[in-house]
Amino acid sequence: LKIAFDKVYFEMGKNSEGKYELILTPEGDRARLMLLHYWLQYAPQELWQKWNFYSSKPGKANSGWGMRMFGVDLVSEDVTLYAEPDNDKNKINLEVYSPKLMELDENQRYSMFFIFLDQFIGELYTMEYIGYIDFVENPSDKKGVRIEELQPMIDNNINSNGWPKFENPTEIYSGYRMEPTEKEGWTLREDIFSGYTSCTPLLNDFYNGESQRFDEAAENGVRFGFLFFENMNVPRENIVNFRGDIEDKIVAQTVPYGIANSLGGATGFHFSYIDFIIYDYDAFISIAKEILAGYDFDEVGYSDFK
């Protein structure tokens, strides 16, 4: 692991079947999860006979499972959930009734509950399918569910309501809209009015001028960046498909070879953008240059997010 990562959090043990397990955790960080998922894809095939590898904590706890933290002993019977599906956002919103958790201060309460929740539904389900979490002081008139019933409820929504099934963190997208700048002398991405992304925290960091995620990726040999090219001469009705065609060509020559993954794209009043997580920068730039050279762009380039 030290060869692959500058810093990584993991657990190691042996399961009931006698197989060793190496469990990495992104600690709830979606950008970090992408690096761990890439690592998982290249775990040596011959090791899988005796090992299980995970890029996030799996959910394995059953009814009656318990933990102790902050001086509180908590078992599944101590927690009642009032779950409300949100089909617009593909999330389950939770109200939590647990007198034992209410004994803790707010930060401790949320910290312990998230760790407890991960044990039952897995870290990925917590990240992808859990919306807001509120703690209530009294039982509700709503129908309550046990925490061990939550994962089947999520699976039912995936199957019945068409929620996206998590397989690759770079392939689950959400759309966004922005107000483009009206000032002169604007910089890259300030012209964007719509886009989609598989890693909203990265965009938030970019616009807020924060660099921790980008620095951490760089320490692990990974870059987050984007291609940009002018779109003013592209008919408005074709602008998204035009960007998509270029993205498809680059993806076809990079993703199968572990060079990069697309993270989404965006449309501005001057430029179109395609966002990437890049594992082999030199190979990626060579491929991108060759493909973009086939178009008659006056303005085209690459930029790191940082």
Language-model features: where?
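An N-terminal, globular interaction/scaffold subdomain
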Residues: 1-51
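Short, glycine- and small/hydrophobic-rich beta-strand elements in well-ordered beta-sheets
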Residues: 3-12, 128-133, 251-269
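Short amphipathic beta-strand and strand-loop transition segments with alternating hydrophobic
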Residues: 9-14, 77-85, 215, 263-265
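Eukaryote-biased, non-catalytic alpha-solenoid scaffold regions
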Residues: 10-15, 20, 26, 50-51, ...
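Extended, low-complexity, amphipathic alpha-helical coiled-coil/linker regions that act as scaffolds
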Residues: 22, 35-40, 131, 139, ...
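C-terminal structured domains
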Residues: 46-52, 57, 178-306
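Short, low-order "capping/linker" segments at domain edges
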Residues: 60-82
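Long, hydrophobic alpha/beta structural blocks
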Residues: 75-182, 199-209
